[in-house]
């Protein structure tokens, strides 16, 4: 996700902006609370630009996977583009949750272009990368691994979702069911 449309937010009424921010904060906090309780785990699979609020949602997940296609990036561009700090916990999640070094977090937050590939892994901005030809395999592998850590209540089985059948054509990607 490229995050919020800042220009749209700038033209919105104050109460709408407040509710928007509350909702996005509650979403991220809900991810982390569900994860901490062990009942649900979240994986962000990033294929493209993941900036601002979009990256903050990814930061709330248990793992971040990034396609290594030389153009997909993660960024918190609020400082260089808007002159404000990421306002909904992005910097805190970078340093406290992901254990990104403070000097790298400073560089990251002042670079509007973002970070990609191996550098994103080295800086602890994402957990895993894979080239486009292996990205879906990485997703399947990590989902299998992470889902095995989910604590089911009272010995009950969780819901097993059937896989979506994906058909990739020149016109785009189609699914049998959504």
Language model features with spans:
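A short, small-residue-rich loop immediately preceding and capping a beta-strand
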Residues: 34-50
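Glycine- (often His-adjacent) and acidic-residue-rich active-site loop
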Residues: 1-29, 80-83
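Glycine-rich phosphate-binding loop at the start of an alpha helix
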Residues: 21, 52, 114
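Short, well-ordered beta-strand core segments
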Residues: 42, 64-65, 129
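Hydrophobic/aromatic residues within transmembrane alpha-helices
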Residues: 5, 57-58, 120
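CoA-thioester-processing core
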Residues: 51-108, 139-142
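Short beta->alpha connector loops at strand-helix junctions that form conserved
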Residues: 46-47, 67-70, 131-133
């Amino acid at each position: 996700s490229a995050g919020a449309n800042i220009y749209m937010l700038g033209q919105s009424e104050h109460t709408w902006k407040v509710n928007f921010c509350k909702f996005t904060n509650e979403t991220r906090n809900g991810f982390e609370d569900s994860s901490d309780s062990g009942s649900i785990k979240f994986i962000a699979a990033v294929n493209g630009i993941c900036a601002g609020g979009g990256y903050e949602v990814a930061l709330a997940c248990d793992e971040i996977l990034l396609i290594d296609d030389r153009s997909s990036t993660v960024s918190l561009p609020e400082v260089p583009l808007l002159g404000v700090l990421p306002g909904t916990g992005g910097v805190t999640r970078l340093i406290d949750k992901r254990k990104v070094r403070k000097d790298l977090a400073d560089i990251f937050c002042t670079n509007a272009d973002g970070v990609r590939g191996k550098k994103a892994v080295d800086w602890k901005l994402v957990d895993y990368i894979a080239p486009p030809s292996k990205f879906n395999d990485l997703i399947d592998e990590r989902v299998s691994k992470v889902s095995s850590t989910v604590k089911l209540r009272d010995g009950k089985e969780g819901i097993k979702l059937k896989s979506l059948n994906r058909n990739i054509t020149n016109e785009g990607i189609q699914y049998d069911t959504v």
